[in-house]
């Protein structure tokens, strides 16, 4: 390995961004590249563990003291994060150079495009990392270029636009930040600005794989120097080449592994409905009650992740009433759960990490998207990849229990479910092939490593 075979990786400070980028670090480390993973946090020692001696985890303050209450104003919060990184990252780079371990590239989260100028000002290559799929980034790009007008309603069903290599999209298929721009002005600006300087970026990385977005990728690659490196699911669930890569190594939440697995072990194959909406989605009380009723009425066993902050919304005596039919937990070991033989389908918010896990592990899905890129992911999950169905909300954006029961029956019992399971298995194989030796993502990771080794 030559001097300077070293890159810095800097994710946005949210678990949904840290997880795929830290997984990418493991793949790079397995190919003898030195990595400094910079985690922005208010803690002096972020709770991330790695078995790789070539991955060094370095914390950078987010501008807040540990335990200090963060501002609810996103503009203020991100200004402090940006200021803190700009003040501390240059010294970190200089110290690395003085220590004889100079970095040659900065891999940074797409939501922080200003880091490209920091990289270039210190002679580093700038590699932007998109934690969302191209199907979403392409939409944001057209908004940025002014070729698509932001609609004003979320629940309208009129056709709005057709993008290159994408299916026709309705209002309820678009990222929520576009349809509710007045509700999320800062976030809308952030997601659009991801593309603001992409034409100057040296390398474009994305947590997807070539076969998954094949048609769209032909157009994308004609515009930018793209390397798809996903799915960033731990190796032991895919190609099994990295024996130590059994989990994500980073979690903000405790997982009650034994409780979940013992309960699942007592169930028949493909008999359990697994329900999890990630770490950020908050259901209104009426919606949570409706979902609870739907799960109960479906007649199937179910494992439902209900965070502690949400449990007070459950119907009175619900836990006692469902008995052995259902298990509610505050968090679950999702990868272990999804690969358990008892799981029949995955009810998901369609966040990209969860969607990619479902695809990679061959699990049929029921999409119940809420915001961000979730509606667009759900559209592709149902209509393009055909690995699940999407619940339909009413005119008020409310999903009724009857609709939920109907969708569970489609996936778990109906003929449609057989075709969905067949497609899910197909994508599982393709995901494994992508990261296996000689696969498209493996080749792309090798190409990236060759630039700096």
Curated annotation (Swiss-Prot):
Q: Does the keyword Transmembrane helix apply?
A: no
Q: Does the keyword Transmembrane apply?
A: no
Identify one Pfam family in the record.
Answer: UDPGT
> Which keywords, in A-to-Z order, does the entry hold?
Glycosyltransferase, Transferase
Q: Where does UDP-alpha-D-glucose bind?
A: 279, 332-334, 349-357, 371-374
Q: Which domain of life is it from?
A: Eukaryota
What's the Enzyme Commission number for this chain? 2.4.1.-
Extract the CDD domains matched here: GT1_Gtf-like
SUPFAM superfamilies documented for this protein: UDP-Glycosyltransferase/glycogen phosphorylase
Which molecular function terms from Gene Ontology are attached?
A: UDP-glucosyltransferase activity
Please state which protein family the record places this protein in: Belongs to the UDP-glycosyltransferase family.
Kindly give the PANTHER family that the UniProt entry links to this protein.
GLUCOSYL/GLUCURONOSYL TRANSFERASES, UDP-GLYCOSYLTRANSFERASE 74E1-RELATED
Query: What protein does this entry describe?
Result: UDP-glycosyltransferase 74E1
Organism encoding this protein: Arabidopsis thaliana
Q: Source gene?
A: UGT74E1
């Amino acid at each position: 390995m030559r001097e300077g075979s070293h890159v810095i990786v800097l994710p946005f400070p949210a678990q949904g961004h840290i997880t795929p980028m830290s997984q990418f670090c493991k793949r790079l480390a397995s190919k003898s590249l030195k990595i400094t993973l910079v985690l922005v946090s208010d803690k002096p020692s972020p709770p991330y563990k790695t078995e790789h001696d070539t991955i060094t985890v370095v914390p950078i303050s987010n501008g807040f003291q540990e335990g200090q209450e963060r501002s609810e104003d996103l503009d203020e919060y991100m200004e402090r994060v940006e200021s803190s990184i700009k003040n501390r990252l240059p010294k970190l780079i200089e110290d690395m150079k003085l220590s004889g371990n100079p970095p040659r590239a900065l891999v940074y989260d797409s939501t922080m495009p200003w880091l490209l100028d920091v990289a270039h000002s210190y002679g580093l290559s700038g590699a932007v990392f998109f934690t969302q799929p191209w199907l979403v980034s392409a939409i944001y790009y057209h908004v940025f270029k002014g070729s698509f007008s932001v609609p004003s309603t979320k629940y309208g069903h009129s056709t709005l636009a057709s993008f290159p290599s994408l299916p026709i999209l309705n209002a309820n298929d678009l990222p929520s930040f576009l349809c509710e721009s007045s509700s999320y002005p800062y976030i809308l600006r952030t997601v659009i600005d991801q593309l603001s300087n992409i034409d100057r970026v040296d390398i474009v990385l994305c947590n997807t794989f070539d076969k998954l977005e094949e048609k769209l990728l032909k157009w994308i690659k004609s515009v930018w120097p793209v390397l798809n490196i996903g799915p960033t699911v731990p190796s032991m669930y895919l190609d099994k080449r990295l024996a130590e890569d059994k989990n994500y190594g980073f979690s903000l939440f405790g997982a009650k592994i034994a409780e979940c697995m013992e309960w699942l072990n007592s169930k028949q194959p493909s008999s359990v409905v697994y329900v999890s909406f990630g770490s950020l989605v908050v259901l209104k009380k009426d919606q949570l009650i409706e979902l609870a009723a739907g799960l109960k009425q479906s007649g199937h066993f179910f494992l439902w992740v209900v965070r502690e902050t949400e449990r007070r919304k459950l119907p009175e005596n619900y836990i006692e009433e469902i008995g052995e039919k259902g298990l509610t937990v505050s968090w679950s070991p999702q990868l272990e759960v999804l690969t358990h033989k008892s799981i029949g389908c995955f009810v998901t918010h369609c966040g990209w990490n969860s969607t990619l896990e479902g695809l990679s592990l061959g699990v049929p899905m029921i999409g119940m998207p809420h915001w961000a890129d979730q509606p667009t992911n759900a559209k592709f999950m149902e209509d393009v990849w055909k690995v699940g169905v999407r619940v339909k909300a009413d005119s008020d954006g409310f999903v009724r229990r009857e609709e939920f029961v109907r969708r569970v029956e489609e996936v778990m019992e109906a003929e449609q479910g057989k075709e969905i399971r067949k497609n899910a298995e197909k994508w599982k194989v393709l995901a494994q092939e992508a990261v296996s030796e000689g696969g498209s993502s493996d080749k792309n990771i090798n190409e990236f490593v060759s630039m700096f080794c």
